[in-house]
A protein has these predicted regions:
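Extracellular adhesion/carbohydrate-binding repeat motifs centered on closely spaced tryptophans
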Residues: 2-563
């Protein structure tokens, strides 16, 4: 449900409701005047207490002795009429009789089961209020009334209540406390109707709306079928799930469970602070973590990816902050790794800085791109989602770009480089990949498509060694840099059958500018210059590695390219 649209609708409703009520009651007053005109055509008629007579244009009710009744109701044809202290028929006015309050219309008749918009009984200059007069004509006071299937509340002065209404002793009054859970608290719209199964956007019940200050904020509330504000978790509100705190305020952004039924926001929405929430999602140790969007949305997200600010930065007005991808399951739980149930692995994040660099440190740079605590090393957790493999940090933020695991955390002792795609991608890649460095230069990578550890292939990890006639290091294609042919060293890790840990060996390869491995025992020239002299050498079963102790010093290169 788009609550932002509803907010605009409620504003329009407030503007039109008062006009509607005035028009409705005006019709009732005119009709009563017509009745009076009809009665005025008579000079006298019988009443239960005596006889009505018109004298000098005014109606009086006389007893059998000919004395005019005063300050009492006289009944005629089943209708009650009131005569005042001068005996005259009272019209369109309040009447107080034996401590009870009534209202007579323009015909002088006591109204019953009807409404009046009028000034209070004892103050004609005060603002008009709505009053309801029951079947006996008495003003409704300190009570709840059902009228045409709708519920209304009235205070001790009989004024119809709107906005937040609370039980006060044996009666009802404007709300004075924000405690909607431990009190009978309801909300009535501008027409006085108690809202049920409805949303309302307003200040908290304890806010004096005649004295609102900058610290007061409006919030969304949901009024259940009972009329009371929802607290805790409320499911199936037009098919969506929402969360509310103990005061009934709809929770937004990051929401966590605090007790058996309680929920709270895990971010700082106080405009008077710097907006920074100190506790990360992993530090909360909450049994439930949800994401509910902003106040114009508010429902719990589920079975989807969401891109949002971390909870420690959510609500901050800072353009330097980054959004992260989070995964939410079908139950609406945000995935945040649980160390009691799963084991993470140490890793370092990298970005491809210069794919043409001579060394790993030239090619890759450590990167703190994806964590609000500004760290590079991290513990990452593997999770399969929709048949794809993703990695997350301890706060549930999806990782991207390159990550290289810590060898000490790997059972086989091999550090593995993975590629997780860009910011809006994130799943672990395998096979051949073309990736651009920071300067926009495209580089070719290859990541193993399965485990073949005895040949040095580890599933989805960047290959170290030969694959399909090409040479790779941490998955990056190794090519000749300055000369047409060059010797390149790569450390190869293999796990022999029946073993659990890997053996490392440095292998030397002859490669050309395209990264193709050369396997002929001959002189390799760049123009007329011999740049690699491999005559007399053999090539091993490591798919093209030079055979002499894998030591590059045994092969002549450049100006010393001789046998």
């Amino acid at each position: 449900m788009q609550l932002g649209f509803l907010k605009q609708f409620q504003k329009h409703k407030k503007e039109s409701a008062f006009i509607m009520r005035k028009q409705t009651k005006l019709v009732a007053v005119v009709s009563a005047s017509a009745l009076l005109a009809l009665g005025a055509s008579l000079t006298s008629f019988a009443a239960s207490k005596g006889t009505w007579m018109m004298v000098d244009g005014e109606w009086y009710c006389y007893d059998k002795n000919g004395d005019a009744y005063e300050n009492t109701f006289c009944t005629s044809n089943g209708k009650d009429y009131y005569v005042g202290d001068d005996g005259q028929l009272v019209r369109s006015a309040w009447v107080e009789d034996d401590g009870n309050y009534y209202f007579v219309n323009s015909a002088g008749q006591k109204i019953t089961n009807d409404w009046r918009l009028t000034a209070p009984y004892d103050d004609d200059s005060a603002e008009e209020q709505w009053y309801y007069f029951k079947s006996n004509g008495k003003r409704a006071e300190d009570e709840k009334i059902t009228y045409k299937g709708k519920t209304y509340f009235f205070d001790s002065e009989g004024e119809m209540l709107t906005g937040w209404v609370q039980k006060s002793g044996d009666g009802w009054d404007e709300a004075s406390t924000a405690d909607v859970k431990g009190t009978e608290t309801y909300y009535c719209d501008e027409t006085g109707v108690r809202l049920e199964n409805s949303w309302v956007y307003d200040y908290a019940p304890d806010v004096d709306q005649d004295d609102i200050n900058s610290d007061d904020d409006e919030h969304w509330y949901y009024l259940k079928s009972s009329g009371q504000a929802a607290t805790g978790k409320k499911s199936n509100v037009k098919g969506q799930t929402y969360f509310f705190d103990e005061e009934g305020k709809m929770l937004t952004g990051w929401v966590v469970k605090t007790g058996s039924n309680g929920y709270t926001q895990a971010w700082n929405d106080d405009d008077d602070t710097d907006g920074h929430f100190e506790t990360t999602l992993s530090e909360l140790n909450a049994s439930e973590i949800h994401f509910c969007g902003d106040e114009d949305d508010g429902h719990m997200k589920k079975d989807k990816w969401v891109k949002a600010y971390s909870n420690t930065q959510y609500g901050e007005d800072d353009d330097d902050n980054d959004k992260y991808w989070f995964w939410i399951n079908k139950s609406g739980d945000v995935y945040v790794p649980d160390d009691s149930k799963e084991t993470g692995i140490g890793a370092t994040r990298y970005k491809l800085d210069d794919c043409e660099g001579d060394t790993f440190d030239d090619q890759f740079k450590e990167d703190n791109y994806d964590d609000d605590d500004n760290t590079i090393g991290l513990t990452m957790y593997e999770k399969k989602i929709n048949s794809k493999t993703y990695y997350f940090n301890a706060n549930g933020q999806m990782l991207s770009k390159f990550v290289k695991t810590d060898a000490s955390d790997e059972e086989d002792g091999v550090a593995k480089m993975y590629y997780l795609g860009g910011w809006d991608d994130g799943y672990r890649k395998d096979g051949s990949q073309t990736i651009k460095d920071e300067a926009g230069t495209a580089a070719r990578f290859y990541f193993a498509t399965s485990d073949n550890k005895d040949e040095g292939y580890f599933n989805a990890a960047g290959i170290n060694g030969a694959k399909s006639g090409k040479l790779y290091s941490d998955g990056l294609l190794v090519t000749a840099d300055d000369d047409k042919y060059e010797i390149k060293d790569v450390t190869i890790y293999t796990v022999a059958e029946g073993q659990t840990t890997a053996t490392a060996q440095v292998a030397s390869y002859i490669v050309n500018k395209s990264g193709s491995i050369q396997t002929a025992a001959k002189e390799y020239k760049d123009d007329d210059d011999v740049v690699v002299d491999a005559t007399g050498f053999s090539f091993s079963g490591t798919k093209g590695a030079l055979y002499k102790s894998f030591n590059t010093s045994t092969v002549a290169t450049g100006s010393n390219a001789t046998k």
